[in-house]
């Protein structure tokens, strides 16, 4: 049996402000840092240990990983950062308040943008200062790989090559891995691992800062998955993600 642990970053400043974040590089709140600390403590107390860790190039995920590993006394393990683990790009919605956007465009339209599989939000204009092509961390990427918006389908297509080429071979080699990433990049991976249908994926919400453990067969098919946390607390945190457009 192989074990993989996923964790969505702790609450970010824009999570607290209920804004669409995407590739915008915002930090953790004090609550988010505390969530990461608690996750690290829980993992350590439950006997988990890791050989390598993976994260995005966005600081809310990087800092979550650091806090978790520090609490586990494992900051020395190899850490791999890659843009393919970034959050889904929310296009022209980035920075907008979710509830206010729902008031302007309607709950149904915002739900489609947030949770449909293959419909992206309106794109950024190429000259928009939020265009990731202006960010030095993406300077060496093929311009065709830099999104101006993404659907979840696009995020799956971005994430899976890195999974197949880099992450999965390490799991098959017996490495114990931790992935600290984002709500939608993790939804993309969970969709793939669990074989969730394109329509059903709309109902999947991943809470911040709670470890999600996968026990995998030798061929990496899931045996089971579960959150490390109080079930009632996990349910409340998950529902809170679903209710963001109502706040």
UniProtKB/Swiss-Prot annotation:
Catalytic EC class: isomerase
Site keyed Transition state stabilizer: positions: 182
Stored CDD domains: HP_PGM_like
Active site: 9 (tele-phosphohistidine intermediate), 87 (proton donor/acceptor)
EC number: 5.4.2.11
Reaction catalysed by this enzyme: (2R)-2-phosphoglycerate = (2R)-3-phosphoglycerate
Function noted in UniProt: Catalyzes the interconversion of 2-phosphoglycerate and 3-phosphoglycerate.
Subunit structure: Homodimer.
Name used for this protein in its record: 2,3-bisphosphoglycerate-dependent phosphoglycerate mutase
Source organism: Geobacter sulfurreducens (strain ATCC 51573 / DSM 12127 / PCA)
Lineage, broadest ranks: Bacteria, Pseudomonadati, Thermodesulfobacteriota, Desulfuromonadia, Geobacterales
């Amino acid at each position: 049996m192989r074990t993989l642990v996923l964790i969505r970053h702790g609450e970010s400043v824009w999570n607290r402000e209920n804004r669409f974040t995407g590739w915008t590089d915002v930090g953790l709140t004090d609550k988010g840092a505390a969530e990461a600390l608690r996750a690290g403590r829980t993992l350590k107390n439950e006997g988990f240990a890791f050989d390598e860790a993976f994260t995005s190039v966005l600081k809310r995920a990087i800092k979550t990983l650091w806090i978790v590993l520090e609490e586990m006394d494992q900051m020395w393990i190899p850490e791999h950062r890659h843009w393919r683990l970034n959050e889904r790009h929310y296009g022209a919605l980035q920075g907008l308040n979710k509830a206010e956007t729902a008031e302007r465009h309607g709950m149904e339209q915002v739900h489609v943008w947030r949770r449909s599989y293959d419909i992206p939000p309106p794109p950024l204009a190429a000259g928009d200062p939020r265009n990731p092509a202006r960010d030095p961390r993406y300077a060496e990427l093929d311009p065709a790989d830099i999104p101006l918006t993404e659907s979840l389908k696009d995020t799956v297509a971005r994430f899976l090559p890195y999974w197949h080429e880099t992450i999965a071979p390490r799991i098959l080699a017996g490495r114990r891995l931790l992935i600290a990433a984002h709500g939608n990049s993790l939804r993309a991976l969970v969709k793939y691992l669990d074989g969730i249908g394109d329509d059903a994926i709309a109902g999947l919400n991943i809470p911040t800062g709670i470890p999600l453990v996968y026990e995998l067969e030798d061929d990496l098919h899931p045996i089971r998955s579960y959150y490390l946390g109080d079930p009632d607390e996990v349910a409340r945190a998950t529902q809170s993600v679903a209710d963001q457009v109502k706040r």
